[in-house]
Amino acid sequence: MNVVYKGKTKDVFLLEDGNYLLKFKDDVTGENGVFDPGANSVGLTMEGAGRAALRLTKLFFERLKEEKIPTHYIDSNVEEGTMKVKPAKIFGNGLEVICRYRAVGSFMRRYGMYAKEGQVLDAFVEVTLKDDERQDPPITKDALDMLGILSLREYDILKDLTKKISGIVKDELSKKGIELYDIKLEFGRIDEDNHIALIDEISGGNMRAYKDGEYIEPLDLEKLIIE
């Protein structure tokens, strides 16, 4: 088992069978000791965050499997903090796809002249480049196509999958009286036919969720959902 990548919140290992093993860490993204799913650096370490992220990821990926939504997930071992996944080809140097139900975070920083904090959004989907140096800039459908990162047809598939997946997560959270404000997803091409599938994770570390108007920390979110 060889280390192929050490990430902000996970390490990636290549397995002998050609699949990969993701090792979840207790680091979360943020700035100045404050959690922020949109941040480009590790902001703090939260004991138990890795296993909490994996428990939610396992829950949601298995839920998506029931809905026949393609993902890279194979299986997981929560006690060891590991998840076995299929190999995936990312788009360009990596894309992040955000689905927004309320105006917060970077949306407000960009559109605060027109938007109100917490304003309801209709599952607004936007794509950003994974580019720390340029602070993950948003990119349009046409630009993705013209730069050879994603075809127009692939963009439509990506957007449709994002809305479906985000809707499922939103519904699961609402069963616990929790409101999903936004969620960040990643996709890649998998298997011989290179179909688009969800990759990475779905956890408290890549979403903002609120209960009774109060923000829920990632570890608390896992406890509320899994209980």
Swiss-Prot record:
Query: What's its EC?
Result: 6.3.2.6
Pfam assignment, any one: SAICAR_synt
Name any one GO molecular function. Answer: ATP binding
UniProt entry keywords in alphabetical sequence:
ATP-binding, Ligase, Nucleotide-binding, Purine biosynthesis
Q: What class of enzyme is it?
A: ligase
Family annotation (InterPro entries): SAICAR_synt/ADE2_N (IPR028923), SAICAR_synthetase (IPR050089)
Catalyzed reactions per annotation:
5-amino-1-(5-phospho-D-ribosyl)imidazole-4-carboxylate + L-aspartate + ATP = (2S)-2-[5-amino-1-(5-phospho-beta-D-ribosyl)imidazole-4-carboxamido]succinate + ADP + phosphate + 2 H(+)
Which pathway does this polypeptide act in? Answer: Purine metabolism; IMP biosynthesis via de novo pathway; 5-amino-1-(5-phospho-D-ribosyl)imidazole-4-carboxamide from 5-amino-1-(5-phospho-D-ribosyl)imidazole-4-carboxylate: step 1/2
- Source domain of life is Bacteria
Family according to the record: Belongs to the SAICAR synthetase family.
Its protein name is: Phosphoribosylaminoimidazole-succinocarboxamide synthase
Name the source organism.
Clostridium tetani (strain Massachusetts / E88)
